[in-house]
Amino acid sequence: MITPVEWEKQARADREAIFFYLYEEAGVLVATATDDKFVSMVDILRENPLAGTKTGSAEKQRKLVVPRFPFIIVYVVENTSIRILRVLHTSRKIAGRYNKS
């Protein structure tokens, strides 16, 4: 079963900021490859919403590590959908970095 995904405003802003930072620092190929990886990871969530692990800070919130990239995707599994809350660099602490809903 494919689960619908909704990107929260902050997650979209995170994704855009990461893209533009990588574009300026490493070029369009790196920026595009990283964004494509985010999309492929979310596609995994569509098929398996529990693929990530619990964040420990809240019962419903989970995180999915992006392999070979220094990022995690923080999300919530709802009854009929998945909400992407944040896309964070692994050097940042998770607690307090996303909206609690």
Give the role of each language-model region.
Residues 1-35:
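Arg/Lys-rich, positively charged N-terminal/basic patches that mediate binding to nucleic acids
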Residues 14-19, 51, 61, 91, ...:
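Catalytic cores of transferase enzymes with a strong primary signal for eukaryotic protein kinases
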Residues 15, 35-38, 42, 68:
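Short amphipathic alpha-helical/adjacent loop interface patches that line ligand
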Residues 31, 53-55, 96:
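Short, hydrophobic secondary-structure boundary micro-motifs
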